[in-house]
Amino acid sequence: MTQTLSQLENSGAFIERHIGPDAAQQQEMLNAVGAQSLNALTGQIVPKDIQLATPPQVGAPATEYAALAELKAIASRNKRFTSYIGMGYTAVQLPPVILRNMLENPGWYTAYTPYQPEVSQGRLEALLNFQQVTLDLTGLDMASASLLDEATAAAEAMAMAKRVSKLKNANRFFVASDVHPQTLDVVRTRAETFGFEVIVDDAQKVLDHQDVFGVLLQQVGTTGEIHDYTALISELKSRKIVVSVAADIMALVLLTAPGKQGADIVFGSAQRFGVPMGYGGPHAAFFAAKDEYKRSMPGRIIGVSKDAAGNTALRMAMQTREQHIRREKANSNICTSQVLLANIASLYAVYHGPVGLKRIANRIHRLTDILAAGLQQKGLKLRHAHYFDTLCVEVADKAGVLARAEAAEINLRSDILNAVGITLDETTTRENVMQLFSVLLGDNHGLDIDTLDKDVAHDSRSIQAAMLRDDEILTHPVFNRYHSETEMMRYMHSLERKDLALNQAMIPLGSCTMKLNAAAEMIPITWPEFAELHPFCPPEQAEGYQQMIAQLADWLVKLTGYDAVCMQPNSGAQGEYAGLLAIRHYHESRNEGHRDICLIPASAHGTNPASAHMSGMQVVVVACDKNGNIDLTDLRAKAEQAGDNLSCIMVTYPSTHGVYEETIREVCEVVHQFGGQVYLDGANMNAQVGITSPGFIGADVSHLNLHKTFCIPHGGGGPGMGPIGVKAHLAPFVPGHSVVQIEGMLTRQGAVSAAPFGSASILPISWMYIRMMGAEGLKKASQVAILNANYIASRLQDAFPVLYTGRDGRVAHECILDIRPLKEETGISELDIAKRLIDYGFHAPTMSFPVAGTLMVEPTESESKVELDRFIDAMLAIRAEIDQVKAGVWPLEDNPLVNAPHIQSELVAEWAHPYSREVAVFPAGVADKYWPTVKRLDDVYGDRNLFCSCVPISEYQ
């Protein structure tokens, strides 16, 4: 039959690229699970009362090329002015070797959080380097592997200060008046839920205030002044007040380390180490503290440990502090950091080394000195005598200066009374400085850069002598070797090949949705139109961003069944926090602020109770029945017991147990009956899109993990995005922003992230995904995700029982394999299976969550039947190996499972095992071999001997 032109144009071509199994493979799998079609399968599995009659109207699909052209036209509406606004954001020069070999490399950006250290040694080493940079620059003992942004780090510093404070009755937190306004905004939001009083005043007046448990100072103030806080910190420490200092990472190259001045906590943004501004993010924050406070620190910490052979190996240390274990008692609700961005900053430091970084920092400071000298020579007054890269210039005709700046396509900071702020950066040239002279002084200023340079080179007093760093930084060999592009490229490749990412194999992690991050989706994030905008630029310069964000928000509204979407939260955990704050403020607006009880099912992810606690709520756990569903009887009893104090329930759908609960609408009705709100965790949205929606089910608010369902890559542990969808009555209570008015959001609430739209520069990824898939593709993606999970469950259930199923023995988009009977029978654990899968070339499924002794498998729609069969064959082969142990062929203490994973060096070492080398490293004829570089890690050793800085190179050899 002759095809029509429309058929030949094939606007839905990307759908077939994104979805792994083709039509024939889908039919084979449907036959295997006993279903006639995708619609028939989802019709059987999804409760009838929540199935959408028609898919959400998000438009027809577009080809990759058409979508890219459409988005390019939108991006072109952004105006790329040169921004000297500062306030924690500067233009950067990302070295092309890092751009090409990391940011644009799926071997780096498609990896998952390194819970499985044996397949993560490369990015763990890069993160350890990041921690070493942090330690050297801050002068402290312990560093984390990044936080979400500088403002969030400030809020975490406040919370940590309270945890470690010996002044248990003190309830006030002091913030110096010259911290960045967005930092203060986020601190105030967090303080409100904790019940802390925030005092904002001149730093020198801090001792005038009583009952202060912690202080936040900023080493280089928001308008540029360098502060020597040595004496003040000493006085504060004598009064047992915990001192946190916000610092500029580039300034720290030249300035004395706050830790050496006595600070307890030091944090800041690593953005200017090579990460584009991106209209606000994503960026990594650094965070360091004294050794005595290490168990109270938030976020990931990479530690040096040993593997089973006694060799040096890296791992995430002290995970017992974190939300997935401690739940509401966790130090923080954060379950994602900013690994990809931290690693860019880390490798920026490696590539430039201490000499290169000092050259960059000195050049920035020299140009600032030259600018200052010229302006003062012409009679303008600087508000601060001591500065690094930022001048606060008093101007008589401020309107005229700003008009000339706009005409020259320059952004100055304009919110300072009778003055403008100018922040220079590594991209600033002498031509830029001459242009600034013209803007501030007029064209006939007569100044000469070289003459001014000679003057300031011999007589610069803009950094106090006491504030100049007198110690060496970055002395470890890793920062002093890889300075040619060839060496750097090879170093990065050596790290990459240690890790297992989606470019090598499926990552079947339950509750993580490790789907395709298509190249076409990733391309726009490095476009200058998106990458180079300052988050606080005038809104008329960001019309492209505003259009893209508005379109994406509109699509998400339609896909979720909500009335509004807030894009600010820059992780799923931040989304939970923002959604719960919206509920809290809604109740307060109705004079029901006493509603503070949050019901959470026993199966919930640990982030849920941690977020509830952060939001000032009390957690009450609701039981699950023997089938893993919410126990309605217990729910009613707990809701009735809470009564007028019921705030909300947090529920995941499909459930964390991997099934569509039949009674989800009844759950919503019970909570609403008692005046509560329904928070539906969007972690499993990949099984809802196009089939049902949170709003249709009856929920009031959800966060959406754009890094799961909507294709933003996990980056090895971040970035993520967690926008929240809300019903109309909650819309006035979503986060606002003190610096930028968010168009279309009538909210006066505080911010939860530093930038108004969170990590805005990765939103084009989700825009591209939805645009290319269209309504039909999005629904089909959900259906194939469900098919793939059921195919795995049906083929593995005889070897590994599926713990929970719904109607007709079906699962949703993931399934839980119960290893407990096998462990009781043979002694082989889920950990042994997880590590043995590495020998077969796979990342392990999620271990012991949500049920201890299990493996949770989520294949996603992007995996082909060939890859699914490869995984299934590996699992069945492992089951056969377990049977060998059971039969006594291999002893329990010496077999391929308990010794897994196996590494190359074992092949040439003495072999004393009762199984062959071939069985060890080429099981079941594995062809495309992934080689881990370390054996199983010793977790106990790692936590007992915590060491979070770089080790000698010899340890890696």
Curated annotation (Swiss-Prot):
Taxonomic placement: Bacteria, Pseudomonadati, Pseudomonadota, Gammaproteobacteria, Enterobacterales
The protein's role, per its UniProt record: The glycine cleavage system catalyzes the degradation of glycine. The P protein binds the alpha-amino group of glycine through its pyridoxal phosphate cofactor; CO(2) is released and the remaining methylamine moiety is then transferred to the lipoamide cofactor of the H protein.
Cross-referenced Pfam families: GcvP2_C, GDC-P
Coiled coil spans: none
Record text on subunit structure and interactions: The glycine cleavage system is composed of four proteins: P, T, L and H.
Cysteine pairs bridged by disulfides in the record: none
Record keywords: Oxidoreductase, Pyridoxal phosphate
Family membership: Belongs to the GcvP family.
Record PTM N6-(pyridoxal phosphate)lysine, positions in chain: K708
Protein name as catalogued: Glycine dehydrogenase (decarboxylating)
Cofactor(s) the record lists: pyridoxal 5'-phosphate
Keyword rRNA-binding: no
Highest rank taxon of the organism: Bacteria
Gene Ontology BP, a term: glycine decarboxylation via glycine cleavage system
Underlying gene: gcvP
Gene Ontology MF term list: glycine binding; glycine dehydrogenase (decarboxylating) activity; pyridoxal phosphate binding
Catalysed reaction equations from the record: N(6)-[(R)-lipoyl]-L-lysyl-[glycine-cleavage complex H protein] + glycine + H(+) = N(6)-[(R)-S(8)-aminomethyldihydrolipoyl]-L-lysyl-[glycine-cleavage complex H protein] + CO2
